[in-house]
Amino acid sequence: MKSYAEALLTDTTGKKSNAQIAREFDAAMNPAGTLGVFTTAKDRSTELRDAVRAHAGNGTANGLWVQVTGGKTKLKGISTGAQDLDLDTDAYGLAVGGEAAVQNITLGAAFMGGSGKTENDSVAGKDDFNYYGFSLYAKTQVQGIDLEGDLSAAWLKSDLTVGGAADVDTDTTTAVYSLGIQAKKTFNLGVDVTPFIGMDVYHIKSDGFTTNHGVSIEDANATIVEFPIGAEVKKAFQTASGFSVAPSFSLAVVPTVGSKDIDSKVRFAGAESTYNYTFADDVKVRSQLGIEAQKDNFTLGLAAGYDWGNEERSAVSVQLHAKYAF
């Protein structure tokens, strides 16, 4: 163990800055934090919620739906207790669901699965991950206001590697348990304008693990609450071929409260330290541009989104979805 620590702190090239040596040492001590596992897991849970809300709120009572999602997230300097992180994440997944009307309530269930990778080039680090999750959701209307609620669980299974002297090859699982509610009301002002407000609770829990060099990282957890506040503008028109086509645009501000940092305790060679990693923004701005085409019982849609967060986050996403109502 001593020789491993010495190798991490020794610059055999004579070209590394003290900051780079510290960055590589931190990556060896806590590869999950260095590769943004907590952020990636939370984003996958949000991805499932977005899919559920898109289909719970589209006005049909009974149906089956499927959504294909792909996207890229960049974190350019998200803060930690030591060196800031620059991360690139690509993720691609599939969500499927179904819903049915029971009196004046629509009940639904959905499942998602996918894979992706996160890279931290500064330490030759990579997280090759798979993810999956499920959601139960419901929708009703009270005095013209649509009320939607969902309960979900998602898991991220990460294979973590870090190159160089760190030479890490390990794995871990991160779980996200979440519940959310949203209220919205549509006003016809020549176009349909739908203001909405919600509250989404996320509890993130990472399993403890030990690296191939005997570094032990303990379990860690945190809870945050997001408050998405925004509106969607939508206009439907009929084509000569009988399709109803509806372009849309939505914009939301999402303030976040709670434990936006995770404290991760590490033990190695008889010593103990705690690493701090920010995994969520204080505030995000989310936007989405989409179009749907409906004919008879079938709906097909395409949407593209862009998010910005105060922790130097930027994310682009594309969703293709289809639904058959009966």
Where are these regions (language model features)?
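Interface/linker segment at the passenger-translocator junction
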Residues: M1-S79
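Membrane translocator/pore-forming domains, dominated by Gram-negative outer-membrane beta-barrels
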Residues: M1, T10, N58-F326
